[in-house]
A protein has these predicted regions:
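Basic, flexible Lys/Arg- and Gly-enriched helix-loop patches that mediate nucleic-acid binding at interfaces
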Residues: 5-242
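Short, charge-rich, low-complexity alpha-helical interaction segments
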Residues: 1-2
Length: 242
């Protein structure tokens, strides 16, 4: 359909996009909705992914060739949660603008990928680092059933030096602890802890009178934080397993 106008309809004007796509493509209303949800439809050159959005008669609707009307596959997203962000608001970062290296992802981001995501590996508000969100039942089951066996690698900066005696006491905790760097002002510790829970490392440090300055999770099981920056996310790759 011709027409270059970009005026958006107000509530109640025009028709539902799914109805327009169904008529234009000669498919069922459900298949039209699936085409839209899969990012195959543009209105006046702009991708639309909400079947209930409305279009006016003069607006140009384009349907990408070759896209099959099938349900959007569930995905797992890996987020670098910034320090200071509560875990119950971290899902707000799962938007296209924060996608790390989308050109290498092998798939296009769809709003459906961010809906219904469940956080399976929470972090304290003050901590930063890797958090896993998933829509996939197999991943959810793995992270739930094997939670006690999955090793979390966490980098922890503490105030001041850490003496050999304190390090020995840390090593008697459930975690494997080593010193990454040490200076008079602060020490960088590496914790490797299976079944880590929010607050557990802080409790271990409190027990030996160490004051935490920063804490960052860099690995869950076999999945690393990799090249993410705070606030960025990426897809769990097909070959990756926790």
């Amino acid at each position: 359909m011709s027409g270059m106008a970009t005026t958006s309809p107000v509530d109640g004007e025009g028709i539902r996009l799914a109805k327009r796509v169904a008529a234009q493509a000669g498919v069922s209303r459900r298949d039209a909705e699936l085409l839209i949800e899969n990012g195959a439809v543009r209105v006046d050159g702009v991708q639309q992914t909400l079947p209930q959005s409305r279009v006016l008669p003069h607006q140009r609707v384009e349907i990408e060739a070759g896209v099959k009307p099938q349900p959007v596959e569930p995905v797992t997203l890996l987020l670098y949660k910034p320090a200071g962000m509560p875990i119950d608001t971290a899902h707000e970062l799962l938007v296209a603008a924060n996608h790390h290296e989308p050109e290498r992802a092998g798939r296009r981001f769809l709003p459906a990928h961010a809906r219904g995501q469940r956080c399976m590996t929470p972090l304290e508000t003050g901590a930063s680092g890797l958090v896993a969100f998933t829509q996939e039942w197999r991943v959810e089951r793995k992270l739930h059933e094997d939670a006690a066996f999955l090793e979390h690698e966490v980098m922890v900066d503490v105030a001041g030096p850490v003496s050999p005696e304190v390090l020995a006491r840390l090593e008697r905790s459930p975690a494997r602890v080593s010193i990454g760097r040490q200076a008079e002002e602060q020490t960088g510790l590496r914790f490797a802890l299976k079944g880590a829970r929010p607050g557990q490392i802080a409790h271990i440090c409190d027990g030996v009178n160490l004051r935490i300055l920063a804490m960052r999770r860099i690995r869950i099981g076999r999945v690393p934080l990799a090249g993410l920056q705070p606030g960025q996310w990426r897809y769990l790759a097909p070959h990756e397993r926790f």
